[in-house]
Amino acid sequence: MRLNTLSPAEGAKHAPKRVGRGIGSGLGKTGGRGHKGQKSRSGGGVRRGFEGGQIPLYRRLPKFGFTSRKAMITAEVRLSELALVEGDVIDLNTLKAANVVGIQIEFVKVILSGEVARPVTLRGLRVTKGARAAIEAAGGKIEE
């Protein structure tokens, strides 16, 4: 067997449809587009969501909600992710340096998910009740 002798299995490949190449092909003249109408023309077709002039669904339904700008700069950090940070004191800058949170994040809340293996000091971060208990049980502390 050589690379130049390899070929697909018989029947594995289908020949492409050759549209508009004579009546004998079955796809001649109109090329499978039927007669006249918007969809038969070049560039023909309607935009997404168009319902023939009827008010489309996306306009019949009311607008709702908004995107909180604070949510874009807030992140939750699991207890297990604190192990990725070097050093005993953890604050926003050390979390960013360890790539635990993104550069644009300004507010962080530590949540109870996973375990904290070593005593750490959290500085300037918000902490849930469960996470606070787990950190203090491991010998760590939380500074405001």
From Swiss-Prot:
Belongs to the universal ribosomal protein uL15 family. Part of the 50S ribosomal subunit. Binds to the 23S rRNA. The lineage of its organism: Bacteria, Pseudomonadati, Pseudomonadota, Gammaproteobacteria, Enterobacterales. InterPro entries: Ribosomal_uL15, Ribosomal_uL15/eL18, Ribosomal_uL15/eL18_sf, Ribosomal_uL15_bac-type, Ribosomal_uL15_CS. GO terms for molecular function: rRNA binding; structural constituent of ribosome. This is Large ribosomal subunit protein uL15. One of its GO terms (biological process) is translation. It comes from Buchnera aphidicola subsp. Acyrthosiphon kondoi. Keywords: Ribonucleoprotein, Ribosomal protein, RNA-binding, rRNA-binding. Residues 1-52 are annotated as: Disordered. Residues 21-31 have a biased composition (Gly residues).
